[in-house]
C-alpha cells in the first residue's frame, strides 16, 4: 500500500479529565471506514466473563530430535536473511520496460508564490480511485508550501496559525528527533508540500504517499514532490487534532528517507511518538489496545478500520521505550537501519543497556516483557520505576481470564507478542503449572503439497524478494512449460508477485500464468502478477516455449509497498519436463537462488514469556523460566500481604502470525 494514512475515529462519548472530542491517528489500509469510539466508562481493568464454550485444545506436538533440529534451523535461516529494499527505478526499468528513469524531476517553476495554481494527483481511499485536483498556494513558509484545493472553504486566520506553528515549531522538532526528510528531494526544492483537498475518502484525516517521492516514469500517480495530504472533508484547519496529524505524517515522510523498509508497527509507533514529543494529543488509541491486549505488537492489520488497537499498542510501546531508556536510546532506535526487534537489540548492544535482572544486555523479548508488565503495574515504586510510564498515564489493561475457585484450569492461546493477563485470587498455597506448544506454523496451512520443504517469500514493507534460476533450453524445439505449486496471501491491489524471463540478464519479460492479473488500480503493478489470495495451494503453469533454443533465466519477484503486507507466497514442486527438470525441494533448493526467499519447513520453535505479578501490600514481579518442553511447575501463595497474583503470558516466536497455545492449571 502506497499510502501512509491517518484514520478518523469519531469519539462518540470520550470525556476523560473533562476533555471530549475527536481523535485521529495512523497508518491504515485504504478503504471505506468510519469507526465509532466506544464509551470509556472507567479507567480500571474489566472483569472477564469465564467462557462456557469448548476451550481451545492444546495440540499434541511431539517432535523427534531431527525435527527439532530442522525447525531450529528454520529460525536461524530466517534470522540471518536480510529482506532487500525495493528499488523503484530498477523495477520500472527491469519489469516495467522503462529506460533510463531519472531519480529526480527538478521543478522548473519553483520557488512558488502565494496565489499560483498547480495540479495534483490524489487518491480516494474509499474506492482506490486516483484523480487530479487543482489547488492554489495559500501559504509559503521557511520549510513548507501549503496548497488548498480550489473551492475548499477555510478561514485565512486558521490557515496562518496552523501553517506557522507547523513550519516553525513542529518541523524543527520532528527533524531534531527523527531526522531529515529527503531534501531538496525529488523536485530539487528545499520546501515540502502540504495539500488540503477533498474527496480523499471518509476514512482518513491525511496521508503520506511514498509514490510522490518517485519520478512519474517510475509511478504513474506520482506528484514528484515531498508532500502529504490533509482531508478537507473530515478535518478543519482550526481543530487541534490536525496539528497531530501533520506531525504524524511528516514523520512518515522523514522515515521513508531514513529507513524505507522499516516494519510498519515501528514506523507507525514513531509517527504516534511524533505527536507525543510535540505535546500534541495522541490519546484514544491506547484505550482501543488495552481493552483487548492480546494483539500482535509486531504485526499490522490488513482490514480497513481494525487498526486502532495497533496504533495504541505501537504508541504505548514507543512512549514506554522513551520513558524507560531515554531520548538518546530512542533517537538511536529511530536512526538504526535494522528493522523491528533486530534494530532494538542493536541499540541495546551499542549503548550497553543492561537488564537489571540478568546483568546482560537487554534482548528485545526482555524489553517487550517489561513493557507488558508495565501496562498492568504502572507503579513507579516497583523495581525503581521499571514498570511505569513517566510522560503519559495509559488506561488500565483488561484481564483476559480469572480463577477465583481452585483447583481450576484454563486452556487458551495468545498472539505472538500479544499478552494475556490471568488473575488468580483464590486464597491459599497452590501448585501452578504451565504448558505451552512446541512449535508454531509460519504460514496458515498444515503441510505443503509434498514432503516438508518449500520456498517462502518472507515478508516486509517497501521490499523486493526474488528467486532466480537459469535453464538451458538450447536443445528444446517444442513446448516448454514450467509448472509448480503455489500458495499466496498478498495485499490486494498493492503488492504483487511476478514471474519474468531474460536471455541476457538485462532485459526482462513478465510472463503470464494461469491466475495472474493485469488489474492495476493503485498504479503499483508492472504487468500480469499474482495478487490477493490463492485460497489454498494451486497449480500454476508458465509457458516458456518462446525461449526454446536459448538459455533463459527465470525470476520470481515479490514487490511490496509501504504499510501493509500479506504473509507472502509459498512455492513447491517445480517441473520443466522439456529438459527433465523436477524438484520437490526436499533435498536441496533445486537450483534456485535469490534474496529474501527461503527454503524451509512450515514450523518454528514456539517460545513464551511468562511472568507472575504479586499484587497486595507491595507489588512484586517474578519472571518464570520454562523447561525445554515449554512447561513449568511452581508454588504460589495468596493471602496476607498478597491479595492476588496475575499471570502474564505472551508468545514470542518471530516471523509468524499464528497464535501460541497454552494451558494453565492451579491445584
PLM feature segments, named:
Residues 140-266, 270, 279-303:
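Juxtacatalytic substrate-recognition/specificity segment
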Residues 24-35, 54, 60-62, 340-467, ...:
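Beta/coil-rich, acidic/histidine-enriched accessory regions frequently appended to metallopeptidases
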Residues 534-566:
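Terminal, low-complexity interaction segments
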Residues 211, 215-223, 240, 244, ...:
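Acidic/His/Gly-enriched intrinsically disordered linker/tail segments
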Residues 480-488, 552-559, 585, 647:
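Extracellular beta-strand-rich recognition modules
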Residues 1-16:
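N-terminal Sec-pathway targeting helices
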Residues 506-547, 626-631:
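Extracellular carbohydrate recognition and processing domains
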Residues 17-20, 33-62:
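Ser/Thr-rich, Proline-interspersed low-complexity disordered segments
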Amino acid at each position: 500500500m502506497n499510502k501512509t494514512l491517518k484514520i478518523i475515529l469519531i469519539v462518540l462519548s470520550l470525556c476523560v479529565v473533562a476533555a471530549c472530542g475527536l481523535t485521529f491517528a495512523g497508518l491504515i489500509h485504504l478503504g471505506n471506514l468510519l469507526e465509532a469510539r466506544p464509551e470509556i466508562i472507567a479507567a480500571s481493568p474489566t472483569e472477564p466473563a469465564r467462557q462456557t464454550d469448548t476451550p481451545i485444545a492444546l495440540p499434541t506436538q511431539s517432535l523427534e530430535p531431527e525435527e527439532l533440529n530442522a525447525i531450529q534451523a528454520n529460525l536461524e535461516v530466517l534470522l540471518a536473511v536480510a529482506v532487500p529494499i525495493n528499488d523503484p527505478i530498477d523495477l520500472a526499468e527491469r519489469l516495467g520496460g522503462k529506460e533510463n528513469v531519472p531519480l529526480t524531476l527538478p521543478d522548473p517553476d519553483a520557488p512558488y508564490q502565494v496565489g499560483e495554481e498547480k495540479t495534483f494527483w490524489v487518491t480516494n481511499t474509499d474506492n482506490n480511485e486516483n484523480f487530479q485536483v487543482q489547488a492554489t498556494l495559500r501559504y509559503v513558509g521557511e520549510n513548507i508550501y501549503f496548497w488548498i484545493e480550489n473551492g475548499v472553504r477555510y478561514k485565512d486566520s486558521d490557515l496562518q496559525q496552523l501553517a506557522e506553528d507547523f513550519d516553525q515549531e513542529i518541523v524543527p522538532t520532528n527533524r531534531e528527533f527523527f531526522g531529515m526528510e529527503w531534501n531538496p528531494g525529488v523536485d530539487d526544492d528545499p520546501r515540502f508540500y502540504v495539500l488540503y483537498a477533498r474527496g480523499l475518502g471518509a476514512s482518513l484525516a491525511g496521508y503520506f504517499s511514498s509514490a510522490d517521492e518517485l519520478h512519474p516514469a517510475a509511478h504513474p500517480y506520482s506528484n514528484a514532490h515531498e508532500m502529504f495530504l490533509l482531508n478537507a472533508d473530515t478535518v478543519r484547519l482550526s481543530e487541534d487534532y490536525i496539528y497531530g496529524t501533520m506531525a504524524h505524517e511528516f514523520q512518515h515522510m522523514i522515515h521513508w528517507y531514513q529507513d524505507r523498509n522499516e516494519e510498519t508497527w515501528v514506523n507507525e509507533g514513531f509517527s504516534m511518538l511524533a505527536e507525543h514529543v510535540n505535546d500534541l494529543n495522541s490519546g484514544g488509541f491506547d484505550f482501543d489496545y488495552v481493552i483487548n491486549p492480546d494483539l500482535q505488537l509486531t504485526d499490522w492489520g490488513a482490514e480497513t478500520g481494525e487498526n486502532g488497537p495497533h496504533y495504541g499498542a505501537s504508541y504505548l510501546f514507543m512512549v514506554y521505550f522513551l520513558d524507560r531508556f531515554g531520548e538518546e536510546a530512542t533517537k538511536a532506535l529511530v536512526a538504526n537501519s535494522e528493522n523491528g526487534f533486530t534494530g532494538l537489540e542493536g541499540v541495546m548492544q551499542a549503548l550497553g543497556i543492561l537488564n537489571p535482572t540478568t546483568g546482560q544486555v537487554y534482548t528485545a523479548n526482555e524489553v517487550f516483557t517489561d513493557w507488558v508488565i508495565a501496562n498492568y503495574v504502572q507503579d513507579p515504586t516497583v523495581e525503581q520505576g521499571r514498570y511505569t510510564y513517566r510522560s503519559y498515564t495509559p488506561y488500565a489493561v483488561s484481564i483476559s481470564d480469572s480463577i477465583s475457585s481452585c483447583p481450576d484450569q484454563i486452556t487458551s492461546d495468545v498472539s505472538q507478542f500479544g499478552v494475556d493477563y490471568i488473575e488468580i485470587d483464590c486464597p491459599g498455597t497452590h501448585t501452578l503449572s504451565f504448558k505451552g506448544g512446541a512449535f508454531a506454523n509460519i504460514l496458515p496451512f498444515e503441510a505443503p503439497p509434498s514432503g516438508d520443504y518449500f520456498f517462502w517469500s518472507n515478508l516486509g514493507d517497501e521490499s523486493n524478494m526474488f528467486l532466480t534460476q537459469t535453464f538451458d533450453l538450447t536443445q528444446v524445439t517444442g513446448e516448454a512449460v514450467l509448472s509448480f505449486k503455489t500458495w499466496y496471501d498478498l495485499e490486494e491491489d498493492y503488492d504483487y508477485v511476478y514471474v519474468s524471463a531474460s536471455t541476457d540478464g538485462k532485459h526482462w519479460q513478465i510472463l503470464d500464468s494461469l491466475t495472474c492479473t493485469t488489474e492495476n488500480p493503485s498504479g503499483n503493478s508492472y504487468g500480469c502478477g499474482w495478487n490477493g489470495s490463492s485460497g489454498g495451494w494451486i497449480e500454476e503453469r508458465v509457458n516458456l516455449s518462446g525461449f526454446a533454443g536459448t538459455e533463459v533465466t527465470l525470476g520470481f519477484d515479490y514487490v511490496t509497498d509501504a504499510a501493509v503486507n500479506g504473509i507472502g507466497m509459498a512455492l513447491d514442486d517445480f517441473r520443466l519436463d522439456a529438459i527433465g527438470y523436477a524438484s520437490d525441494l526436499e533435498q536441496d533448493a533445486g537450483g534456485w537462488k535469490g534474496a529474501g526467499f527461503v527454503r524451509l519447513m512450515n514450523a518454528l520453535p514456539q517460545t513464551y514469556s511468562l511472568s507472575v505479578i504479586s499484587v497486595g501490600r507491595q507489588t512484586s514481579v517474578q519472571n518464570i523460566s520454562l523447561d525445554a518442553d515449554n512447561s513449568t511447575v511452581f508454588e504460589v501463595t495468596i493471602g496476607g500481604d498478597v491479595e492476588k497474583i496475575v499471570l502474564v503470558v505472551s508468545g514470542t516466536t518471530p516471523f509468524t502470525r499464528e497464535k501460541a497455545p497454552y494451558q494453565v492449571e492451579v491445584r
